[in-house]
Amino acid sequence: MSLEQVIKEIEQSQEIKKKEILENTKNILDKMEAEKKAKIDEIRALYQEKMRAESSRITASIIDKANIEARSILRNKIEEILEGYVSAAQEILRNIRNMPEYPALLNKMIEVAKKYLGQDCIIKVDSKDKAVAPSSGITYSNIDPYGGILASSRDGKVELDLRVSSIMEEVLEKIKVKIYTRLEE
């Protein structure tokens, strides 16, 4: 074998090795590029999911705050309306004694007290109602600015509060409870 052939074989061998090295390098770079792309896609998907979850959480928080604020506005408006009705009802109560139905109402309250507490029960009527209440078995005192009666059994164990202001407070409280219960549904 001549020197030229040996040199040519060496050059061919080097050329083959260069091609192998280039091919291996290209394969390694392609593999690294594919791994890089896969990692980027994985990170992107992870952050997109985190952003979706955070967006959902923020949206839910905004909706909750809006609902709370809307309910607060509604409660305030209802309270305002109720106050208007309470004022109107109190105005009517202030003048209930002047109504033609009041003597019959007062006598009905006395009948109810005697029916449930006994004929010998103690009945207190406001002094201002002396003219419209029957006089037998009735005690007169300042029990309520609007009228009504306070009654108790003879032994004092059972009391019946039929004062107009007490009844009105009770009714208003029940109305408020019903309204707020419906709001919470």
From Swiss-Prot:
It is found in: Cell membrane. It is a peripheral membrane protein. GO terms for cellular component: plasma membrane; proton-transporting two-sector ATPase complex, catalytic domain. Gene3D superfamilies: ATP synthase, E subunit, C-terminal. GO terms for molecular function: ATP binding; proton-transporting ATP synthase activity, rotational mechanism; proton-transporting ATPase activity, rotational mechanism. GO terms for biological process: proton motive force-driven plasma membrane ATP synthesis. InterPro entries: ATPase_E_C (IPR038495), ATPase_V1_Esu (IPR002842). The keyword Cell cycle does not apply. Keywords: ATP synthesis, Cell membrane, Hydrogen ion transport, Ion transport, Membrane, Transport. SUPFAM superfamilies: V-type ATPase subunit E-like (SSF160527). It comes from the Archaea. Has multiple subunits with at least A(3), B(3), C, D, E, F, H, I and proteolipid K(x). Belongs to the V-ATPase E subunit family. Component of the A-type ATP synthase that produces ATP from ADP in the presence of a proton gradient across the membrane. This is A-type ATP synthase subunit E. It comes from Thermoplasma volcanium (strain ATCC 51530 / DSM 4299 / JCM 9571 / NBRC 15438 / GSS1).
